Design a protein with these regions (language model features):
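Conserved beta-strand hairpin/beta-sheet module of binuclear metal-dependent hydrolase folds
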Residues: 1-45
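Active-site HxH/HxHxD metal-binding segment of metal-dependent hydrolases
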Residues: 13, 32-128
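Structural motif
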Residues: 21, 129-130
Length: 130
């Protein structure tokens, strides 16, 4: 049976979606280095695909943690998103502390970081055969 779970990252309150069946999973917007990874392990799911909707840090902060834990996972994103993963201005890590302060969470340390580009890019549509 196909199961869809949502993980809400508590700091920026962004969502990650885990879609899984029979031990396999697709991850959409891995927003946190620990939460989605721990949930995937608890469910016994191995992510085969990660889909990024855009490059902002609150949607990809857990990307490298998942890549390091499951080196065979395949990442798909638009070409613009893929390029933005490696740019602290575009992925918003340079401004995240200010954003969080405006959201009522002042004083939070959020060091800038970058991620490796996507394995596959697309422009308008992505077809996932899974």
């Amino acid at each position: 049976m196909l199961l869809l779970e949502r993980w809400t990252e508590p700091l920026a309150e962004s969502n990650c979606y885990l879609l899984g069946e029979a031990g396999r999973a697709v991850v959409i917007d891995p927003n946190d280095p620990r939460g989605p990874l721990e949930r995937l392990e608890a469910l016994g799911w191995t992510p085969e695909r990660i889909l990024l909707t855009h490059e902002h840090c609150d949607h990809m902060a857990g990307l490298e943690a998942l890549r390091n834990r499951w080196p065979g996972v395949w990442v798909a994103a638009t070409a613009a998103c893929s390029a933005g993963l490696g740019d602290t201005r575009l992925n918003m890590t340079r401004r995240m502390e200010v954003y969080l302060a405006f959201r009522g969470k002042p004083g939070v340390s959020y060091p800038p970081f970058v991620c490796r580009p996507a394995d596959e890019t697309y422009e308008h549509a992505w077809e996932c055969v899974w």
